[in-house]
Amino acid sequence: SCINYGARLIRLLVPDREGQSENVVLGLADAEAYGNDQASFGATVGPVAGRIAEGKWGAVQLEQNAGKHHIHGGSRGWGQQFWGFTTEETAEAVSVTFSLESTPETVGYPGRLQAKISYTLDAEGCLTITMTGACSEETLFNPTSHIYFNLSGEAKRPITEHILQLACEEVLELDTDKLPTGKKR
């Protein structure tokens, strides 16, 4: 299930070993609760995910909404916007595509950015998330999907019992303010 506030994925039913479908996405009790959500449950975060030091990008001063830094597109970032949407269903897949025009007036980033995010669930149960953006001028674009998963279904077991394995050769180091240092490990 998705909602257009923040282009959020809020529920994903997956069959367990016995074939019983259970929700593996953590979320809030009801749709109204997302209006006060500080954790961005299931939200599309952008135009930039993560922190920007002192809210500065060249000559552009962004909102400093995380102490002296800027995080997740600011207080009016994409997770706090209502998106337009379309749905499509075929024999192979079902999808929802959210669209939003992000402007300097709404988020403070340069240019008029046409953003799209699609959630597609195919017949085999594979979820694909696709994000695209086209802007009228040079700007920052580094969104993410802020979905919290608990693969035990209905959050029956704590996340500390999960193992995450990433196929990467390096990770980017963060400093104590959770800002990228530029060093790779």
Task: Report residues per predicted region.
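Surface-exposed acidic/polar loop and edge beta-strand patches at domain peripheries
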Residues: 1-185
